[in-house]
Amino acid sequence: MTTQTPQIPETMRAAVLRDTEVGLQVETIRTPHPRTGEVLVKVAACGMCHSDLHVIGGAIAFPLPAVLGHEIAGTIVELGPGVEHTGLKVGQNVAGGFLMPCGQCEACSSGRDELCAPFFELNRLKGVLYDGETRLSTLEGEPVYMYSMGGLAEYAVVPATAVAPTPDNIELVPASILGCAALTGYGAVRRGADLHYGETVAVVAVGGVGTNIVQIASAFGAKQVIAIDVSDEKLAPMKGYGATATINSAKTDAREEVLRLTGGKGVDVSFEALGIPATWTTALDVLADGGRMVPIGLGAGVQTAGVEINRTVRRSQSILGSYGARTRQDLPAVVDLASEGVINYKEIVSKHFSLEQADEGYKALRDQKIQGRAVVDMSL
């Protein structure tokens, strides 16, 4: 049995990708409905992330037509069967996480949501949910595939495992960035690095995810948090988020400056938040002996980065990949940190686009014109 409110329309608007040469175009498609273990969310806003950009540009293969958008906030309007006893309710405001654990596989059973095999095999490769089918279709019944929940639409079906209720003091539109930008930042600091109080940190590339890493690392007690980027505009607000120093690596030798700031040692942990060879090199260059480099940024396609073998071996340095976080445990924690003011999610959102402007917004992101995070705001 499903539980729903009666105001759900039969159709909705969605930004659909049919051709990577054309980009996103708004279409009217059928409003989806949740199946077992899922909820339907009326989307208030959807964050705009580089991962979507890789698909839009064709660098990451994905079945088309598709609705992208993988971090949302909104209101539950329908519960699928089996959700009644989870505590989720119609009318509840929630944040939706991009990494949607199936809850049944070996990784999920051991609490490692970030390694959920069905998520990668079904959703990330085939654009479907865990019964092997998409929830989206055109008015004619043509399947439309889902990148995560397909949040660039007025409504989105999300597994109940990937939503967390938000309290009344959380603003829904900016809260859309909690499900990827903040969740990924939290996972990198808490899970990937296992950051300890008093350690020193460098964050290479301070976009939406990098900015969250800066403030979360500071909140977790890092002694120094050094923000590194090639944009003075992006670096300007970093001290307000907890950075103790900033470095423009286009103007200053990042390694030399980090060594100066750390008394010649380098940092205990460096985070790489863009996914290109240059930022990998910088993140490795600033590491101390025994340091941990945590890459978070996804590369385009099968992009590779070089590692200096002897230095990594002789200096006992570690590279610890971090993808998202453990959604069922960590998304509620991220919401709590935002509610308590530890994560400043509102100011990170620098631009709002309407659904019709989604393609324009991703072009601005591609052209590095977005500071922090932009969102598609369904109220516009």
Regions found by a protein language model. Give the residues of each.
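Mid-domain Rossmann-like dinucleotide-binding core that forms the NAD(H)/NADP(H) cofactor-binding site
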Residues: 90, 154-155, 161-163, 167-252, ...
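Conserved amphipathic alpha-helix within the SDR
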Residues: 254-264
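Cysteine-cluster motifs in flexible loop/terminal segments that predominantly coordinate metals
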Residues: 98-155, 159-161
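A generic alpha-to-beta junction signature in SAM-dependent methyltransferases
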Residues: 195, 262, 274, 287-288
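Glycine-rich beta-strand-centered segment in the early N-terminal region that forms part
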Residues: 30-46, 59-109, 113-114, 122, ...
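Glycine-rich phosphate-binding loop and adjacent beta-alpha segment
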Residues: 221-222, 239, 244, 249, ...
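N-terminal Rossmann-like NAD(P) cofactor-binding module of classical short-chain dehydrogenase/reductase
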Residues: 271
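C-terminal hydrophobic helical "lid"/dimerization subdomain
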Residues: 2-10, 281-285, 328-380
